[in-house]
Amino acid sequence: MNKILRGVIQFRNTIRKDLVKQFEEIKNNPSPTAVMFTCMDSRMLPTRFTQSQVGDMFVVRNAGNMIPDAPNYGAFSEVSVNTEPAALELAVKRGGIRHIVVCGHSDCKAINTLYGLHQCPKNFDVTSPMDHWVRRNGFASVKRLNERLHRGPSSMKFESEVAPSQSFDAIIDPMDTLAMEDKLSQINVLQQLINICSHEFLKEYLESGRLHIHGMWFDIYKGEDYLFSKDKKRFVVIDEKTVTDLLAELNARYPVPEDQDGPVAFAKSN
């Protein structure tokens, strides 16, 4: 708490004035362009590595950047009283955003826990909320990892029954350079995109092209951001050499609706 309180004092003496001014400027017309689901890991600073400013995007954080599959919440048609679907509704139906981003990262402690439980199920602690969280919501990702290990770096199909247009193919770690946990982390990001599609209240937005979902991955120790390219079927590092092609893919796949002006919101923010 000492560090937190002293940080508040530093904030008051440095950027507070400018930040309040920014709050005032967007007070009556906030216009976030995306909602990002990312991990609660203290090393993950999404507003820094995307250089987002006040009002640019919603950010939702939890252990392992997971958005549980709709059936995991309860009976069919049961209202989900949970953070993740509530955040999706707030951002999409009430906030009007057009882009959902799921951003995972390397050396993720939640994913490491999931992989550890997969390797040694007897270590599952029935009293641990964390163990229950990652096992329940990471099971599909573990199945995908097993598929990847069995088939090698070949294309895998990620399919959505609710929103078929959002299905895609992916090749995970084609050069086999990542640790097993990081392979699982990338798979987990893509599985969350399918999980998002499972929420019926988003179907009309997804199928009509009013809403788009994206997978990102951050390499903690290299400081490199990756975007999943549906054209290339893999995570592609975002740098000066690739950004033009990535933006071209985004604009081709997600054209701006006739009632909107300017470039794709997600592309514009990058």
Curated annotation (Swiss-Prot):
Gene Ontology MF annotations: carbonate dehydratase activity; zinc ion binding
Entry cofactors: Zn(2+)
Key word Ion transport present: no
InterPro entries reported for this sequence: Beta_CA_cladeB, Carbonic_anhydrase, Carbonic_anhydrase_sf
EC identifiers of the protein: 4.2.1.1
The entry's keywords: Lyase, Metal-binding, Zinc
Keyword field contains Zinc: yes
Record Pfam families: Pro_CA (PF00484)
Note on how the cofactor is bound: Binds 1 zinc ion per subunit.
SMART domains: Pro_CA (SM00947)
Catalytic activity: hydrogencarbonate + H(+) = CO2 + H2O
GO biological process: IRE1-mediated unfolded protein response
Protein name: Beta carbonic anhydrase 1
Species of the source: Caenorhabditis elegans
